[in-house]
């Protein structure tokens, strides 16, 4: 664990989240928002303990995530919220499987087993044309549509899954300068549309963009 910088009310650390959270005081976090590595889809490191290197979503990745959620439920304060960004994961041909892994459902089930309360999830729609070009998914491409429509499917959305830690929230979050009523009308929509979200406006977008990325 490495402390990168800090202020009077915050600290920024760099380290492996699972062993690092084990060192953190209980009930020391006010809010957690994160996106877990998607198993077998993106490789971030060569480490065996990296969730992204898990080949089997239903066993290996499930075990990794269970350690994570148990520590997360311990360090977040009672009554506070946790928001997780996830998506469903296509099964790879190399595994001999077809269809989708229910990664959204897996995170919900593991979170509940760790003691968290599953409260809600927002759906974030995706541009099907952009996703077809980026992923080269035959289920989305026009070629697949014109070859055999039985195999066609829609674009895969993202999800924002909201958990809450059991207990009473000691400090009420009610500042009127953070979220206006008009903002809340938009944010409370069950599905956020891709036309209103700038998907490429992310951290390190220039450094992380490939030559064929749109």
Language-model segments: residues:
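Core catalytic lobe of class I
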Residues: 1-214
